[in-house]
Amino acid sequence: MTSPGAPRQLRPTDIKRLNRSWRRLTQARLALLLDSVGQPFNVGSIIRTAAALGVGRIWLCGNCASPDHPSARKTALGTERLVSCESEPSAAAAAAAAAADGLRVIAIELTDGAIPLHEAPLSGDVCLALGNEDHGCSAALLAAADVIAYIPQTGRVGSLNVAAAAAIALAEARRREWSDG
């Protein structure tokens, strides 16, 4: 039993109202490019996060797991119907498609010359690009990217799960839009 004035979880109608208010503050288009993300549960998790943060399109390229794989669909929990997923034969082709659509391509990767994500130019229409679980973004994707950014980490682990990295990058892009707008 909760005491009067204690926080309570929102009801579904309250959540819908809250989400509508955030959607009104959202102008920029946000997309993803997945370069050979091979594990179906990672693809499904990324799709679910993408749907939650208003991503309009996901380009899948290279040896990327299919969003139709049973494990991807199970992890996505039906949200795959809310995000357009398109296949491209290569990361370079996917990056070119994103650029042709007016999106700035920002690869999330640890490289020489990469900038911290919180300093990356995330304003406007952006396509965040993430790579394979073991090898990261391909050389072709890094060459095609407008910017390469990394997620600063202070712990003793050298990398993040690709689905976690996607969630952090997407949330930072939206947070920046909402706080700068």
Language-model features, listed with the residues they occupy:
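Post-transcriptional modification and biogenesis factors for structured RNAs
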Residues: 1-181
